[in-house]
Each structure stands twice: as C-alpha cells, then as structure tokens.
Amino acid sequence: MGTRLRALLGVLILLVLGGAGWLFLRWEPTLLPIRLIQIEGEVHHHSSQQLQERLTERLHGGILTADLVDLKQTAEELPWVGQATLRRVWPDTLRVQVREYRPIARWSLDGLVTADGIVFRPQGGSIPSNLPLLEGDDKRAPEITARYQAWQAALERVGRGIQRLSVDPRGDWRLKLASGAELRLGTTMVEERLARYLASASQLEAAGRPLTVDLRYSNGFSVKWAPNTDTGVRAHPDRVAARAGNRR
C-alpha cells in the first residue's frame, strides 16, 4: 500500500470518527437521556420538586454529556443551598446530594447567618422570627457570630439569653437579653465587661428589673431600673451600682 493511499485512509478514518462523534453528541440526549433527578440530603426550605425543576430547566445533554459543573452552580444559586454534589448514575439518573445552610440567627434586616458566620439572604423566603437577631457589617459576621455563641453559652449558665446582639460602625457592642434588659459593652474590653455583668447578674435581678446596664466604666457599671421596681430595694431609678472610673 502506497504512502498516498495510507494517508487517504487515515483521513477517511478521522472523518468517519469525527462524524460519528458529532452524531453521538447530537443524538446522545435522545439515546441516553437523564430521566430522573434524585435529590438526597435534608431539604427543608426548598422541596425536591423545586430543585428538580430548576435543574431540569438548566439541563442540556444526556447522561454522558450533561454539564455537572453548571448544574452544581444552578443548585447552589438557591439561597438556602450551601453545597450541592452531583454525580451520574447509569443509565439515566442524576443524583444530587444537598447540604443546606442551617441558620442560628437572623442577620440585620433581611438575612440569616450560620454558625460559621456565613450570611445568606433568602429571596422571597420567610425569615424565622423566633431566631435571635445579630446586626453589624457583613464583613464582621464571623466575629459577631462567634461572640454570640460564646456569650450565649455564658449567659445561659446564669439563666439568661440573647435576643439581639449588635455592633455599630464605631465598634460599639450592645446586647439585649430575653428579659428585656440592655447591656452596653462599649468598644473596648468587651469580654471583661460582660464577665463583670455575669458576676452580678443574680444580684441585679434580685434587686429589681434592670432596663439598661451600662458597663462602659473602668471598674463597675450603672443601672437604669424599670419604674415599678420596689423603691424599698433601691434609692433612685437611675441608681449607680459599683460605679468607679470614667466611662469608655
């Protein structure tokens, strides 16, 4: 067989293979379609049907040619979906493992935040009103969330709980407890100031119903009491407790 003939046969083989490949890609969705999208994992806020519909709209190709990277991104665009893992299951199934975000608190006006400080905003979804509220810059979410969890655990040990935790752009920290009392921690030494409150929490509650506990002093705090607090226990509605030093 001459060199020219071998070259011609090589070209013909490449054309045949190329044509076959083109035909396969063209007809593969028909010959090997994805007939079932199987959702696994805990899907509380987006039903399996809703996620299936989103993936079906985005699906192009069959079991061999479907773009799993694109489908993964589509699944993770749903606000509650933290991570999606997709794999092909022969002959006609796409299996999707879903891990949803699990919020521990509301975040500012329209968001939720996870224990890791990941902020997400369900578009058109309901925000659970029974969760505590955290407020601050999104960039500080990991720090705020970590402090919320640590402080909540410490407060629970003295029978208290956090309803709202906020930090403003100046770094001024405030806590509102489930009892209605507000703690002013200021911008510095916030851990020490909270510890000061914890050490006196029982005595404060025994003395009356504090509305505001201002801990922004170098040594001590001031208390604003509820109007109906027993006047026999205290001398003045704005009595200062263990106050010393300048407020910061």
UniProtKB/Swiss-Prot annotation:
Superkingdom of this protein's organism = Bacteria
Q: What are the residue boundaries of the POTRA domain, all occurrences included?
A: 32-101
Q: Which residues lie on this side of the membrane: Cytoplasmic?
A: 1-4
Instruction: Kindly list the GO CC terms recorded for this protein.
Output: cell division site; plasma membrane
Location(s) in or outside the cell: Cell inner membrane
Q: Which HAMAP family match?
A: FtsQ_subfam
What name appears for this protein in its UniProt entry? Cell division protein FtsQ
Name the species this protein comes from. Answer: Allochromatium vinosum (strain ATCC 17899 / DSM 180 / NBRC 103801 / NCIMB 10441 / D) (Chromatium vinosum)
